[in-house]
């Protein structure tokens, strides 16, 4: 994917929502399956944090097409994943600041907070 500027390691919920609406991004949920069952952002692909290394090729392929917006509950695990992905050469990824919790408060209040 060609991008004129270097993508930041983190992205605000509003900016993420804009990229998703434009079809330029895909959501990657790195929480555990039981958390995904509690609440999720529509269209997100569940890849628990522990499974990310085994699914690196899948993530690399997705990042060739769109920006990966990685999220978790509050943004800690997702930032760890984004830092790891960057070290593997996956540049088109960013962690959702505040995770699904801030997304619920700023973008979509229909997403349950927990």
Residue ranges and their predicted role:
Residues 71:
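Short, surface-exposed ligand- or partner-binding patches at beta-edge/loop junctions that are enriched
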Residues 1-25, 33-67, 76-114:
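Rhodanese-like catalytic fold shared by cysteine-dependent sulfurtransferases
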């Amino acid at each position: 994917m060609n991008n004129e500027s270097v993508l930041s390691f983190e992205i605000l919920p509003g900016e993420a929502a804009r990229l998703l609406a434009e079809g330029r991004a895909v959501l990657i949920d790195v929480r555990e399956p039981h958390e995904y069952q509690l609440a999720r952002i529509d269209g997100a692909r569940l890849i628990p944090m522990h499974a990310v290394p085994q699914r690196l090729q899948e993530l690399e392929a997705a990042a060739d097409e769109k920006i990966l917006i990685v999220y978790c509950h509050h943004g800690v695990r997702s930032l760890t994943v984004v830092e790891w992905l960057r070290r593997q050469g996956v540049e088109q990824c960013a962690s959702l600041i505040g995770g699904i919790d801030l997304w619920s408060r700023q973008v979509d209040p229909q997403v349950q907070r927990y």
